[in-house]
């Protein structure tokens, strides 16, 4: 019994150690699970942060693209505006015939380039000899020109109304045919202003009777089918 009495405490102590060992291993396993879960959470957080950065990068890219589109649209609008303003300027040409030798008229339908050859005096007026060239790829016929002429245009705004009242104008009809790329001589007769005083000329195209084709008869060169 004595021996058995000693054995029982030893057995109890061993059992206690066994239970403590089980608790230790259970706690260690729990810690490992928690560490593993923590790693998984960190991985998920890192993935979310990466996705967030990717989304932010996409948003920044979209914002840059949008800004680029806006800037490009503004530039295109500005360019179109400048072209339209220049186009309106080319609807007619204003020049000092004593100083200008070359000019362009382009109203969107017809494009002409011109060069002034000479200005000669006539009774109560002037005659301008010039060449015109058709910038289109097809012949243009029956051109008419609206012309305004006079003395030098004043630089002061207060003098413009009186100057405009003294300007002369007329419409010059013609049956000339302007072939593509070919210079054609034209004579303008401007009454009322001598060559020494002729410092302003405005030329515009009248489209009323314009023909976009050759007015010269074309021989039929098609061969008749043999019977």
From Swiss-Prot:
It comes from the Bacteria. Gene3D superfamilies: Lipoprotein YajI-like. Keywords: Cell inner membrane, Cell membrane, Coiled coil, Lipoprotein, Membrane, Palmitate, Signal. A lipid is attached at residue 22 (S-diacylglycerol cysteine). A lipid is attached at residue 22 (N-palmitoyl cysteine). Residues 1-21 form the signal peptide. Residues 31-68 form a coiled coil. It is found in: Cell inner membrane. InterPro entries: YajI-like_sf. GO terms for cellular component: plasma membrane. Disulfide bonds: none annotated. It is a lipid-anchor. The homotrimer is held together by an extended N-terminal coiled coil, which leads into three separate globular C-terminal domains of beta-sandwich topology. Homotrimer. Required for proper surface expression of the autotransporter adhesin SadA. Could be directly involved in the biogenesis of functionally active SadA. This is Inner membrane lipoprotein SadB. It comes from Salmonella typhimurium (strain LT2 / SGSC1412 / ATCC 700720). The gene is sadB.
